[in-house]
Amino acid sequence: MSEIAQKVKSIIVEKLGVEESEVTTEASFTNDLGADSLDTVELIMEFEKEFNISIPDEQAENITTVGQAIAYLEQHVK
């Protein structure tokens, strides 16, 4: 698992209060991990802060699973 993937998982566990075993790449923030729309926005903001990047709203809307978050960050974090 990449360093980015591990950080993403840690942020999700901390912010959503879920078990690390629940945070799989296929897991949906809302359907599987119990996040509401505000939680999802807060996750995106935390990813931006942790990785020092800006995620445009139109792209943030497409990040709905753990795997999508990891893939986006691995592409955009230098």
UniProtKB/Swiss-Prot annotation:
Organism (species): Cytophaga hutchinsonii (strain ATCC 33406 / DSM 1761 / CIP 103989 / NBRC 15051 / NCIMB 9469 / D465)
Highest taxon above the source species: Bacteria
Protein name: Acyl carrier protein
Record-linked PANTHER family: ACYL CARRIER PROTEIN, CARRIER DOMAIN-CONTAINING PROTEIN
Pathway(s) served: Lipid metabolism; fatty acid biosynthesis
HAMAP family, per database record: Acyl_carrier
Function: Carrier of the growing fatty acid chain in fatty acid biosynthesis.
Record GO biological process: lipid A biosynthetic process
Residue list for modification O-(pantetheine 4'-phosphoryl)serine: S37
GO cellular component: cytosol; membrane
Domain Carrier: 2-77
UniProt keyword Transferase, yes or no: no
Protein location: Cytoplasm
Pfam families linked: PP-binding
PTM description: 4'-phosphopantetheine is transferred from CoA to a specific serine of apo-ACP by AcpS. This modification is essential for activity because fatty acids are bound in thioester linkage to the sulfhydryl of the prosthetic group.
